């Protein structure tokens, strides 16, 4: 069976779309619906009328699980040790509420 998942985005540009969201949605579908073997996923940007699409197959889901479990392991380690190293992103300057962070452009 084939499943379709769409995440509607209100951002102004699809230029920096995070396809990781599509991967996680596909893994969620595979976990909850054993009869689904293909997921067609999309990020639909409603403001700029752009769409980012990808297709995922159950047969290759183990590769995606390895990727995401590795990322989760890093988060779990940070939580266990209460060490949260700051990382810069495009949101730091205008949107971060952590004023004491070295990457916050408003401090």
For each of these PLM feature ranges, what is it?
Residues 1-107:
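RecB-family 4Fe-4S metal-dependent nuclease core
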């Amino acid at each position: 069976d084939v499943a379709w998942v769409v995440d509607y985005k209100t951002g102004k540009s699809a230029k920096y779309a995070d396809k990781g969201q599509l991967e996680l949605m596909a893994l969620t579908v595979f976990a909850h619906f054993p009869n689904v073997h293909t997921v067609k996923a999309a990020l639909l940007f409603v403001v700029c009328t752009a769409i980012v699409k990808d297709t995922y197959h159950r047969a290759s889901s183990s590769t995606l699980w390895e990727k995401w479990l590795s990322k989760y392991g890093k988060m779990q380690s940070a939580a266990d040790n209460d060490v949260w190293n700051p990382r810069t992103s495009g949101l730091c300057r205008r949107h971060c509420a952590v004023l004491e962070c070295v990457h916050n452009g408003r401090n």
